[in-house]
């Protein structure tokens, strides 16, 4: 996966996506215009590259679902929902952890299997991804 992953990061950089995604924040994956997954990362560029690799390799159920949607002609896109405002990695991770929970509880994306609790984003309820 390492080589394919690094090639994917380089491809995203060539496409001019580094300035948008090389930050800590909250991102989403969409099928058509519907948000189907929300995640957080200290470096969204690298995390989104991991998702591209997952879709290509079908390494998890959510990626197989996304690959099938793409195969059927539905566009799969990524977008930024929130950029971390805090300074320092520990503060950024706490900030985006809390914000991610807010976004997941608001949108209830079908591919998120962990729903962070409002009172403590480190605790969550689990659900399965139905086929």
Each language-model region and where it sits:
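Generic signature of intrinsically disordered, low-complexity, basic-rich segments
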Residues: 4-6, 63-65, 114
């Amino acid at each position: 996966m390492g080589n394919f992953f690094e090639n994917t990061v380089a491809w995203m950089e060539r496409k001019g996506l580094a300035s948008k995604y090389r930050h800590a924040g909250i991102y989403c994956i969409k099928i058509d215009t519907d948000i189907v997954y929300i995640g957080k990362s200290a470096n969204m560029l690298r995390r989104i590259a991991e998702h591209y690799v997952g879709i290509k390799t079908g390494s998890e159920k959510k990626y197989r679902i996304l690959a099938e949607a793409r195969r059927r002609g539905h566009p799969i896109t990524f977008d930024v929902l929130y950029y971390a405002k805090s300074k320092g990695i520990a503060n950024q991770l706490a900030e985006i952890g809390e914000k991610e929970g807010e976004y997941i509880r608001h949108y209830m994306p079908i591919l998120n299997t962990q729903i962070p609790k409002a009172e403590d984003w480190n605790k969550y309820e689990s659900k399965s991804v139905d086929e």
